[in-house]
Amino acid sequence: KFSVVLERTVRELRGERCLNIEDDISSKKQIVVSRSFGERVSNLETLKPIVSNFAVRAAEKLRSERQKCSQVSVFVRTSPFNKNKPQHSDLRTIGLITPTNDTRDILTAAKKGLLPIFRSGYDYAKAGIILNKFTNEHVKQHSLFKDPNDPKQNTKLMKYLDQMNSYETQIYYAS
């Protein structure tokens, strides 16, 4: 007649351990990489490499969590504190056909999301990438419409790129 929570509370008050702290460690539900700019950005060609860099960092974080994502969101916004300038804020979400943690796929989605939300004539103060809809990296899902490249090669390539980026050298992607 009691709820599960009340039953656990009673049992724990009697000295019986019901939940381990380690049992409740859950992986992240989303990864956000964003920054406010020191100087306002009003040019798409300046904004593209910034957003690309955010996508690369987000993909690295995703792999460090041993996850894949099915959704990439890109956002841009002007400063809400500068009332004298025109305001613009937008977000575009791109669904991925199959879950991925491949930087190249996330970069492609980020670029696809950035182009329709950018408006010339605005001084952007912040941009970012949001990854969500995670699955475990060991779960394999293939698309009927996409010829999967050798997933082992993609995994190895991303591992090597992460190792190279963790040293003093850094790989830059053309965007």
Where are these predicted regions, by residue range?
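DNA-contacting surface of Y-family translesion DNA polymerases
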Residues: 1-123, 139
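Acidic, metal-coordinating catalytic segment for phosphate/diphosphate chemistry
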Residues: 88, 96-175
